[in-house]
């Protein structure tokens, strides 16, 4: 690059300006986030874990609000906020561009041509933000200097005693396997630094894992454990040479541009692009796989990129086996999940075989998951154990070993979580199960002396908490505010804290300790089994979700292919239709030309035919006129003949009608005479019948009168006999009473004379009540018998009389000749019902009862109806 060229100089000035803007942005925005994270980490270090978690009130409105806001807070920056589905509102070109922006890490090609990947970490970002304000002036001055400088200052990072001891022990183990290399500087990098991206990448700095603490897991649940475990970054002293690094240059541009953002003049391995720095520090903790759309897995470009990544991984594995002078402390499991690439490590095969094998298995599992199209969703976060300058050193008389200190540090770091604003809002089951598992994993590493034994308690009063209670507590813990999330994110196991220990005063301390350890071991085994079961269920659910998403995406892609095929077919059909239309137009033109020629020939023929037709028409018209004249004369002659014939017929008809009228008149006269004679005869018969009936009536009345007189006479005689009988009985009764009174008086005198006692009460039994009737009945009323009333008012409760022997007399008008005459007269002279009663309106039950019921308009009787109702809506039913 020529220094005198104006274009590159302007480009360098533009880069300087952009970089200064980025530094100001980091100072004003990102630094505030880093300060908040640092304060949260300090609170996590110094907080007291024995306090009870503060629970938020759970109201129905809050529950509903939480359910509605389950959308992840961490969304892709390049994603359209309106876009909701993969198959809508995005063309294929925009999707490809978006996929590259999401999945492609930021690379910058240096002057030597090596593409190197670098991302900002928490430590680097915090250091750069802290030194940004102080180094702006030096950056402007160094940009004009233009002389290459070599940065040799070192960054001093204080570490705790346990970390220093573990790092020294690890370095002593690695001295035999690693070749000597100049130690220039110790630095702390995140998992994302120095990851090989393409196959043509040059030599990269190797990585040494000094201390990688992991909970022992079985191969069965190792995949889940790696996806959910919390990584720990231990600080060790590693060195790397600036002069030997392929990415380092001594150009004046690098000195001028990179100096403002370096902490204590530490030159990073590669320059960072502005696009990579725009991403927030909190977003650096989120997996890139979760932001890559699923559609990228089914495209050919994504498959080619996966192949190139696998080849770069193989090259990185080979390069990782070569010894290098510099080393980094990187948590491989989190780095591989975050970047989806292999990270080479420089650990000897003979040292720490288990720790080296686990990342390789994770790499294989990750490759399988990539090939299957199901990206994992790690929830782990990088944990950096950095001691503050005010932290106290460990006591000289410390009795715990280095391993116990590291275990305690792991337990403390294991409870750290990103702020609640960064964490993705989880569902109900995830909020219950995930914190419980992470808490139990951390509690397994806690020492036993932290447990405070509960007071002795009978076994029947021990409360065995259910699993739902722990889940409820963990769910409430996840629903707290961001300020309380750090204090309440850790909870002691309810079983470990509250389960009482059996205290036997007869046993020794050793026996008690052994029993306690045995019970603790059994509880840990039970918790481990439960945790494994929960992890298995979670893995199965994740697999089901992945399969559903793949199936849905496959259907979407198939639908797109079908739509494209339909478009192609429609396009072909349109082209064929246009071709057919063109052919039809050509044929129509040819046909029109032929038709014109044919019309000309036919026109001449038609003119000739028309001339001949006119001549023939004139001849036919003349013949028709002649024939019409002849026909008219013939019709006139026929009409005259017809009129004469009609006149003759009319005269004959008149004579015949006169004869018929005369005959009818004679017949009518004879009929009237016969009717008169018949009427006279009937009148005579009627009079004779009336006379006979009157005679019979007179005789019957006379007979009835005689019968009544006889009945009255018999009744009088009966009454007279009854009166005589009554008088006779009364006389007998009176005589009996007198005789009885005389006897009683005689007896009373005899008793008084015999006893000579005064004031005696005598009971006299008088037979008067039975001797005669106390209230004699009066004369019975004689019923009045009338000829015309049929005795309707007498004994109305009697049953029907026998027709052959009726008890009551039948009136004369209801029997005999009077009844037959009345029937004959009514038959020949029927009464006019309309004149007598008027027009009878049909009954309407609604008017009668002042109600409306549906059954009024229905026939509900069981009768056989042979005719339809006259008025269906008005005729009442007989069943009502």
UniProtKB/Swiss-Prot annotation:
The keyword tRNA-binding does not apply. Residues 352-366, 434-445 have a biased composition (Acidic residues). One of its GO terms (biological process) is positive regulation of mitotic sister chromatid separation. InterPro entries: INCENP_N, Inner_centromere_prot_ARK-bd. Residues 52-104, 175-229, 303-322, 350-461, 513-541, 563-617, 629-713, 775-813 are annotated as: Disordered. The keyword Translocase does not apply. Residues 194-203, 563-596, 604-617, 630-713 have a biased composition (Basic and acidic residues). Glycans are attached at residue 450. One of its GO terms (cellular component) is synaptonemal complex. It is found in: Chromosome, Centromere; Cytoplasm, Cytoskeleton, Spindle; Nucleus; Chromosome, Centromere, Kinetochore. Residues 506-733 are annotated as: SAH. Residues 506-759 form a coiled coil. Component of the chromosomal passenger complex (CPC), a complex that acts as a key regulator of mitosis. The CPC complex has essential functions at the centromere in ensuring correct chromosome alignment and segregation and is required for chromatin-induced microtubule stabilization and spindle assembly. Acts as a scaffold regulating CPC localization and activity. The IN box mediates interaction with AURKB and AURKC. The SAH (single alpha-helix) region is characterized by a high content of charged residues which are predicted to stabilize the alpha-helical structure by ionic bonds. It can refold after extension suggesting an in vivo force-dependent function. The isolated SAH domain is monomeric. Component of the chromosomal passenger complex (CPC) composed of at least BIRC5/survivin, CDCA8/borealin, INCENP, AURKB or AURKC; in the complex binds directly to AURKB or AURKC via the IN box, and forms a triple-helix bundle-based subcomplex with BIRC5 and CDCA8 via its N-terminus. The reported homodimerization is questioned as the SAH domain is shown to be monomeric. Interacts with H2AZ1. Interacts with CBX1 and CBX3. Interacts with tubulin beta chain. Interacts with EVI5. Interacts with CBX5; POGZ and INCENP compete for interaction with CBX5. Interacts with POGZ. Interacts with JTB. This is Inner centromere protein. It comes from Mus musculus.
